[in-house]
A protein has these predicted regions:
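Conserved micro-motifs of the catalytic ATP-binding
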Residues: 22-27, 66-71
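Short conserved segments within the C-terminal catalytic ATPase subdomain
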Residues: 48-60
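Short helix-loop "hinge" at the ATP-lid/N-box region of the Bergerat-fold HATPase_c
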Residues: 87-88
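Short beta-strand/loop element within the Bergerat-fold HATPase_c
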Residues: 96-106
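Acidic ATP/Mg2+-coordinating residue in the GHKL
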Residues: 114
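Short helix N-cap motif at coil->helix boundaries in the Bergerat
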Residues: 118-126
C-alpha cells in the first residue's frame, strides 16, 4: 500500500495541474527570494537520496545577491524539481545537472542544464512553440513523459515569465526561465 503522505502529495500535485490548466492563478503570491527558493529546490532533490550517477551543481550568477519577486514559492520549487527530475529520468546512465540563478535585464533568471542525451530536434521545436505537449507512457508502462514539462510551462506562464529550451553544448538540454523581478516589499 502507498503511504498516506505520498497520496496526499500526489493529490496535491494533481490539483496544481488542474488549477493551472483552467487558467486559475496561483493564490499564494508573496514576496520571495528567488536565489533562496532555487537553492531549497536543489537541496530537496539532493536530500532525497540522489543516485551517485548524478551530480547537481548550484551556482549564483551574482554571488551573495538576493533577488526578489512576487511568486508562489511552492509552485516555483515544484517547477525546478520537475526540471531536475526530468534530467534524471531521461538520462538513466547519469549526467551532470547545473542550476544557475541570477538577474538579467530586470528579470530573475534560472538556467537548468544537463550534459545528458539531449532531446530530439522536433520535440525541441514543439516545446519552444508552446504547443500542447502530449504525454507518452514509457516502455516501463509506469512513467508518463511530458507532464512535468507541461507543468513547468504553466507555472512560468502563471508568473508572467518565459521559458525556452535549447541544446546544451556539447550535448544535453538547457532550459532557460525568466521571471519578472519585483522590488522588495517593505
Amino acid at each position: 500500500p502507498m503511504p498516506m503522505k505520498c497520496c496526499i502529495k500526489t493529490a496535491s500535485g494533481f490539483g496544481v495541474t488542474t488549477k493551472l490548466e483552467y487558467a486559475l492563478q496561483p493564490v499564494h503570491f508573496q514576496d520571495m527570494d528567488w536565489v533562496e527558493t532555487s537553492r531549497q529546490a536543489v537541496s530537496e532533490v539532493l536530500n532525497s537520496g540522489l543516485d551517485s550517477r548524478y551530480e547537481i551543481v548550484f551556482a549564483e550568477m551574482q554571488p551573495g545577491r538576493s533577488l526578489h519577486l512576487l511568486g508562489d514559492d511552492g509552485l516555483l520549487r515544484r517547477m525546478l524539481d520537475n526540471l531536475i527530475r526530468n534530467s534524471i529520468t531521461h538520462n538513466p546512465h547519469g549526467c551532470r545537472i547545473s542550476v544557475s540563478v541570477g538577474e538579467e535585464k530586470g528579470h530573475c533568471l534560472c538556467i537548468v542544464s544537463d550534459d545528458g542525451i539531449g532531446i530530439e530536434p522536433e520535440r525541441l521545436k514543439v516545446l519552444n512553440r508552446g504547443d500542447d505537449i502530449t504525454s507518452t507512457q514509457g516502455s516501463d508502462e509506469k512513467n508518463e513523459h511530458g507532464l512535468g514539462l507541461k507543468l513547468v510551462m504553466q507555472i512560468v506562464k502563471a508568473h508572467r515569465g518565459t521559458v525556452s529550451f535549447s541544446d546544451s553544448t556539447p550535448h544535453g538540454l538547457e532550459v532557460r526561465i525568466s521571471l519578472p523581478t519585483q522590488p522588495l516589499i517593505s
